[in-house]
Amino acid sequence: MPTFRTLDEADLAGKRVLVRVDLNVPMDEGRVTDDTRIQAILPTIRAITEKGGKAILLSHFGRPKGRDASQSLAPVAAAVGERLGAPVAFAGDCIGSDAEAAVSTLAPGAVLVLENTRFHAGEEKNAADFVQQLAALGDIYVNDAFSAAHRAHASTEGLAHKLPAFAGRSMQKELEALAKALEAPQRPVLAVVGGAKVSSKLELLGNLTAKVDILVIGGGMANTFLAAKGVKVGKSLCEHDLADTARQIIATAASHGCEIVLPVDAVVTKTFAAHADHRVVPVDQVAEDEMILDAGPATVALVREKLKGAKTVVWNGPFGAFELPPFDAATVAVAKAVAEATKAGALLSVAGGGDTVAALNHAGAAGDFSYVSTAGGAFLEWLEGKQLPGVEALRR
């Protein structure tokens, strides 16, 4: 039984349901260019309207300093209506007379988008008076924005203390997937952590060494670990000043019985460009004028071998400069191996973080992972073992 209330438990008929969603979508000249986040909230909207509830959507958009017409949610509301295949009304404010008038005219089953919550300073301050004004517009609160759950703002956290609070379908799916991956996982758990810098993932690495059985480190951050072990990495991206930190992480992992897997070979080049001349070498044979841009085939084979025994995989960050072919090979090969094992029922696989989602989509593997989180910052904070205010506020 989940530790939070879901829409299945809510009496929604005729109720004004304030739904915190994430409509902070990419736009170009008034058109939505990626509707992933809109698609994610449709099941929640439908669950509310089918039960006769009035769905009133709250979201931020961008980082406006006060009211800014260029950051209005009006064009996004139109896009929600198109994807929903139903009329979606829009109110020019999220509090005050405009919002009150729009809410008062809603019939059961109707959908309304309120204007950008960040047009008001009270949103990010989680100001009591702003929370109260929002709460006055609803009878029930639903949070369906895991991607904003790491922020203790009025619409993500404050409202949950003022109205009966429930998790939306997308939030529920995310929390259930994450619980299976790290809170009560099937072991062994293998984590893949890649990306450019160790400095941006220190807390994450520290938390994972205590929770997983095998930690595979790739990307630019692997160079820092290799250098800390005395390997010369040439001109590769490397945080030499973090050598002590890397050694500390290796020691912590050993004390927890967590095996760290580093690249054993590398794809090196002298030029940071797609299709640059390159060669594959063991990691201890990188020339002074070369840089590592990907893990090599022996590393891929090693990771595939480790995957055979794993029951759960958590992935954050690519293995190499995946946006520059052919330096995408390791990321693509390992992603496909995880996807195949998941499809065969051998693995539960959870991945997240902006670059990670892009890398898995590039590999054509995202669809076969058990769960791919589009949450970015909230997913990272969860991996770091932090409590997320928006989630904590939903707990029973």
Curated annotation (Swiss-Prot):
Summary of subunit composition and partner proteins: Monomer.
The entry's keywords: ATP-binding, Cytoplasm, Glycolysis, Kinase, Nucleotide-binding, Transferase
Family affiliation: Belongs to the phosphoglycerate kinase family.
Protein name per the record: Phosphoglycerate kinase
Gene: pgk
EC number: 2.7.2.3
Amino-acid positions noted as binding substrate in the UniProt annotation, renumbered to this chain: 22-24, 37, 60-63, 118, 151
GO CC terms of this entry: cytosol
Domain of life: Bacteria
Swiss-Prot/TrEMBL GO biological process terms: gluconeogenesis; glycolytic process
InterPro entries (UniProt xref): Phosphoglycerate_kinase, Phosphoglycerate_kinase_CS, Phosphoglycerate_kinase_N, Phosphoglycerate_kinase_sf
Compartments where located: Cytoplasm
Lineage of producing organism: Bacteria, Pseudomonadati, Pseudomonadota, Alphaproteobacteria, Hyphomicrobiales
GO molecular function list: ADP binding; ATP binding; phosphoglycerate kinase activity
Organism per entry: Azorhizobium caulinodans (strain ATCC 43989 / DSM 5975 / JCM 20966 / LMG 6465 / NBRC 14845 / NCIMB 13405 / ORS 571)
Enzyme class: transferase
Pathway involvement of the protein, from the record: Carbohydrate degradation; glycolysis; pyruvate from D-glyceraldehyde 3-phosphate: step 2/5
Reaction(s) catalysed by this chain's protein: (2R)-3-phosphoglycerate + ATP = (2R)-3-phospho-glyceroyl phosphate + ADP
Annotated positions binding ATP: 201, 323, 353-356
